[in-house]
Structures are given as C-alpha cells and as structure tokens.
Amino acid sequence: MKELSADVIIYGGSLGGTLAAYSAAKTGRRTFLFAESDWIGGQLTVQAVPPDEHKFIEETGCTASYRAYRKKVREHYRSHPYIIDSLKNKDYFCPGGSTVSRLAHPPKLALKLLMEMLEPFLASGTLKVFYSS
C-alpha cells in the first residue's frame, strides 16, 4: 500500500470544503480534499441549489475567495452574446434571474469555475482531490 502524507486534510467536497482546500493550497500546504461524489462544490453543483446568502453579500460578509468566485460567475455572463447590455453593465446582477438567490447559475458552470480556481494547485501537486471517497 502506498503511503500518502499531507499538511491539511479536508473531508467534504462541499463549497466550503472546496474553498478551504483552495485556501490551504494557496499557502503552499500539501492539501488533500476528499469529496463524497465525483463532483466538488456541494450545494452549487451536486445539489443544484443556488447559493443561499444574506442580504448584504454584495458588500460584506464573505471571504475574498468566495467574492472572487462570485465575480467569475458574473464575468462569464457578461461575455455571453445573449445577455443584454443593460444587464451586463450592472455591478451586481443575478444571471438566473432568481428571487431566491442573488447569484443563481447552472451547476456545470459552478463546477467549471471551481475547477479553474483549483487547477494551478492540482497541476503543481499541492492539491489532490479524492473523488467518491
């Protein structure tokens, strides 16, 4: 049996677990993320539920990593040819037009953006994700 070692081990590929692994890997710590399914991102991906956030989320009350993720979602839609200019020019808009969340978007987009955030650390070996574990 091959022995593995890590500085940080996170069990749970939820959005919180994924961003915790991202934050740990960013500091250079060898990080293992164990995900229950074959997708990371929890609520935003596997559960297909938009983020449930407080009413001040656009100004305060979240980490820099999550704020960067939110910005990437909106940037994706700003570059989409079918989004009208009046919407593209707003600082904050809900791509899915939801009244439940301020940032409704499809699970596959959430997974794509999360994987893009993790990619440099996956490529360097700083982060390893164990799926369906």
Language model feature labels by segment:
Residues R29-R30, A35-S133:
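Conserved N-terminal/central alpha/beta ligand/cofactor-binding core
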Residues G17:
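N-terminal Rossmann-fold NAD(P) dinucleotide-binding loop
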Residues K2-S14, F32:
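Beta1/beta-strand and adjacent pyrophosphate-binding region of the FAD-binding site
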Residues A24:
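Aromatic pocket-lining residues of Rossmann-like dinucleotide-binding sites
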